[in-house]
UniProtKB/Swiss-Prot annotation:
Gene3D superfamilies: 3.40.50.11270, 4-hydroxy-3-methylbut-2-enyl diphosphate reductase, catalytic domain. It comes from Shewanella oneidensis (strain ATCC 700550 / JCM 31522 / CIP 106686 / LMG 19005 / NCIMB 14063 / MR-1). (2E)-4-hydroxy-3-methylbut-2-enyl diphosphate binds at H50, H83, H133, T176, S234, S235, N236, S278. Dimethylallyl diphosphate binds at H50, H83, H133, S234, S235, N236, S278. Keywords: 4Fe-4S, Iron, Iron-sulfur, Isoprene biosynthesis, Metal-binding, Oxidoreductase. Its EC number is 1.17.7.4. HAMAP family: IspH (MF_00191). The gene is ispH. The active site is at E135 (proton donor). It catalyses: isopentenyl diphosphate + 2 oxidized [2Fe-2S]-[ferredoxin] + H2O = (2E)-4-hydroxy-3-methylbut-2-enyl diphosphate + 2 reduced [2Fe-2S]-[ferredoxin] + 2 H(+); dimethylallyl diphosphate + 2 oxidized [2Fe-2S]-[ferredoxin] + H2O = (2E)-4-hydroxy-3-methylbut-2-enyl diphosphate + 2 reduced [2Fe-2S]-[ferredoxin] + 2 H(+). This is 4-hydroxy-3-methylbut-2-enyl diphosphate reductase. [4Fe-4S] cluster binds at C21, C105, C206. GO terms for biological process: dimethylallyl diphosphate biosynthetic process; isopentenyl diphosphate biosynthetic process, methylerythritol 4-phosphate pathway; terpenoid biosynthetic process. The lineage of its organism: Bacteria, Pseudomonadati, Pseudomonadota, Gammaproteobacteria, Alteromonadales.
Length: 318
């Protein structure tokens, strides 16, 4: 289907902030620097960030992505992904003599430390997150006290059926790719059932997740369609799409410009484009160019919250 070239201009509104966050920037930089300083192959446990384009680019430069450490030969370099790993994985790497560079996002590490402290004190810990996500697996793997317990919940319904040892000795943490709004109802249910439960400090919330969701929320009411640039296995990218759908705005998740379907734009005059925290800006610009070919278009950068957070790479890689 082709658009009538005489049709009204399509207003393409670019959300801000969008795309790479400081944790993703740092993780990619760690792999790039390791490839520059040491001879390939450089092994990376799990996709360093959840973006197909980024992973393929690093593969082409000599990175080898594996799911488990038994795929890494002894005495080699291994990089842990931005999502973090369990204590058991760290112990295995040490026992195998692997040289580790840790690309775990510092905000994920803060959550890990909370769980570790809870384990040490025997406080039972509840994690709000999505089963099967590597960050969740790594976070739950920080708890090793057999006299306590760590539990995963995904919804208010899970709170009602949750069985704990001591309802007066509880804390909770959240997956970093969930925003305040994502967890609001679950936390309310936790506080109602366990009034003495302790939660994380507000400054432990991932700024990037919240900022990108706020930008989508602010734009959704003013557009007919939202395009999210991100891979299907990217939790935060999926949340952006879901947020738009909840507000009544049609939304699609695209990995690249090749995924754009012209039928989505029938009778559309305003479209917003954003990107998950692991999607590079080059993909955003390619998507914008693909949309602009469908009809006479005007591209507008929408003002949003400024981000200046930077996380340093390990000293050995500087």
């Amino acid at each position: 289907m082709k658009f009538d070239p005489t049709s009204p201009s399509l207003n393409i509104m670019l959300a801000n902030p969008r795309g790479f966050c400081a944790g993703v920037d740092r993780a990619i930089s760690i792999v790039e620097r390791a490839l520059e300083l040491f001879s390939p192959p450089i092994y990376v446990r799990h996709e360093v960030v959840h973006n197909r384009y980024v992973v393929q680019n690093l593969k082409d430069r000599g990175a080898v992505f594996v799911e488990e450490l038994d795929q890494v030969p002894d005495n080699n370099i291994v990089i842990f992904s931005a999502h973090g790993v369990s204590q058991a994985v760290r112990a295995e790497a040490k026992a195998r003599g692997l040289r580790v560079f840790d690309a775990t996002c510092p905000l994920v590490t803060k959550v890990h430390l909370q769980v570790t402290r809870a384990s040490r004190k025997g406080i039972e810990c509840i994690l709000i997150g999505h089963a099967g996500h590597p960050e969740v697996e790594g976070t739950m793997g920080q708890y090793d006290n057999p006299n306590g317990g760590v539990y995963l919940i995904e919804s208010p319904a899970d709170v009602e059926t949750l069985e704990v040892r001591d309802p007066n000795n509880l804390c909770f943490v959240t997956q970093t790719t969930l925003s305040v709004d994502d967890t609001l109802d679950i936390i309310s249910a936790l506080l109602k059932r366990f009034p003495s439960i302790e939660g994380p400090r507000k400054d432990d919330i991932c700024y990037a997740t919240q900022n990108r969701q706020d930008a989508v929320r602010n734009l959704s009411a003013d557009v007919d369609l939202l395009i999210v640039v991100g891979s299907k296995n990217s939790s935060n990218s999926n949340r952006l799409r879901e947020l738009a759908l909840k507000t009544g705005t049609q939304s699609y998740l695209v990995d690249t410009a090749d995924d754009i379907d012209s039928s989505w734009f029938e009778n559309i005059t305003k479209v917003a484009v954003t990107a998950g925290a692991s999607a590079p800006e080059v993909l955003v610009q390619q998507v914008v160019q693909a949309i602009a070919k469908l009809a006479p278009s005007v591209v507008t950068e929408v003002e949003g919250r400024k981000e200046d957070t930077v996380f340093a790479v390990p000293a050995e890689l500087r």
